[in-house]
Design a protein with these regions (language model features):
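N-terminal secretory signal peptides and thylakoid transit peptides that target proteins
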Residues: 1-18
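Phosphate-binding glycine-rich loop
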Residues: 75, 85-124, 142
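PLP-dependent aminotransferase-like
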Residues: 117-175
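Conserved PLP-binding catalytic core of the aspartate aminotransferase-like
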Residues: 151-153, 295, 307-340
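Active-site pre-lysine segment of PLP-dependent enzymes
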Residues: 159-168, 181-204, 208-239
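PLP-dependent aminotransferase class I/II
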Residues: 231-313
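PLP-dependent enzyme catalytic core of the Aspartate aminotransferase-like
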Residues: 336-340, 348-391
Length: 391
């Protein structure tokens, strides 16, 4: 079972652990940084469409903006009561005690807290590959060893392989559902069975950042496992459906003792973000509008990819992963699009022939479509007939 370590001990040990990182770990960290989106010199690159970070361009909602304006007078105070108010609001809606809810500066901080709680002193973590790298990146900086399990032939989590790789030494197992960058989901019944079994040996962290976009009947949240007291953590965010990526507010669910352990490593959330999140959480109309506009943009993107005969994976999120063609290179495609003022997703190893593009406003999608037609016609990528993953 995972060891216990306080935040103070963690900070004291971090320097020593970091100094002892192996070359392999450092190389893996460098690989992730090199493939990530780095700041651009926007004086040299005139950005016309931001389709690289899976953002929701329609937020924050009007109610969230008004709440932030009203909260300016509290900017001189540390957050306290605002944290509790939002935690209680979320707990009431989800049907669990407030001590089973934790807030963070985006769901990325929930993942970082989990890495710091379960990864130090040579801890082993397990994740699919490729998937969202936030947990792996945080874990490697403190010297944890991360096992990567490749996706299956349908670009989905290989749960059987992940189960086999979860030994007693593995302290934390990470599942991103829907998965980033592929947009695929693990059906609820299969994931629930996996979580119940694997959580007997390890903590299972299910990242549900794109939960609000999914309308597939076979999908379901794993929050019921947190309610029932399993060794399961659920993370969600206000960055996606709520359109608040720049405000950095996320939240999670777990058994109360797990939440208490995570809280040792939590930083504060700013009062404006808390005010906006509290208002947006109670604004189903805006959430529905975001969902509708995302579906429209995604449908438009599918039509463009069909027209140009690109193969893509049907997505359950606000981005689409598509195949550029045999021997095409995602980095070359990124460069070609950037020259046209369009930002697309980073390269995801080992799928170097694939590109991820986020949905945006309809104007942004049309700008992307025009550029994609141009890039394709110039032979910078090899267009291939669309084919869905095997069932």
């Amino acid at each position: 079972m995972p060891i216990s370590m306080t935040r103070r001990q963690m900070l004291m040990n971090t320097g020593a652990v970091a100094a002892g990182l192996t070359l392999g770990r450092a190389t893996a960290r460098a690989e992730w940084i090199a493939s990530s989106t780095l700041p651009l010199d926007e004086e040299k690159v005139k950005v016309r469409a931001r389709l690289h970070n899976n953002e929701n361009p329609f937020g924050p909602s009007e109610k969230a903006r008004r709440a932030m304006t009203d909260a300016f007078n509290e900017g001189c105070r540390y957050p306290g009561g605002q944290n509790k108010k939002l935690e209680e609001l979320i707990a009431k809606k989800e049907g669990l005690p407030a001590d089973q809810v934790i807030l963070g500066a985006g769901s990325g901080e929930i993942l970082r807290m989990a890495a710091m709680a379960y990864g130090p002193q040579g801890g082993e973590l397990l994740t699919a590959h490729p998937t969202y790298e936030g947990l792996e990146s945080a874990a490697r900086t403190i010297g944890a060893f991360v096992h990567r399990v490749p996706l299956n032939k349908n670009f989905e989590h290989d749960l059987d392989a992940m189960d086999r790789r979860t030994t007693q030494a593995v302290r934390l197992v990470f599942v991103c559902n829907p998965n980033n960058p592929t947009g695929t989901i693990v059906p609820g019944d299969r994931l629930r069975t996996f979580c119940k079994e694997v959580s007997k040996r390890s903590i299972v962290l299910v990242d549900e950042a794109y939960h609000d976009y999914v309308d597939a009947p076979q999908y379901s949240s794993m929050i019921d496992l947190a309610r029932e007291g399993h060794n399961v953590i659920i993370s969600r965010t206000f960055s996606k459906i709520h359109g608040m990526a720049g405000l950095r507010v996320g939240y999670g669910f777990a058994r109360s003792d797990i939440v208490a352990r995570l809280r040792q490593f939590r930083n504060q959330i700013n009062v404006l973000g808390l005010a906006a999140a509290t208002a947006s959480y109670q604004d189903p109309e805006f959430q529905g509008l975001s969902r509708k506009r995302n579906a429209e943009a995604r449908s438009y993107l599918y039509k463009v990819l069909d027209e140009l005969r690109y193969r893509y994976i049907p997505s359950h999120a606000n981005f689409v992963f598509f195949h550029l063609g045999k021997d095409a290179q995602a980095q070359a495609f990124r460069d070609a699009m950037e020259k046209r003022g369009i930002l697309v997703g980073r390269v995801f190893q080992p799928y170097t022939e694939w590109a991820r593009v986020s949905t945006g406003t309809m104007d942004e999608m049309k700008i992307f479509a025009t550029a994609l037609r141009e890039v394709t016609s110039q032979g910078l990528t090899a267009a291939k007939k669309q084919a869905e993953p095997e069932n």
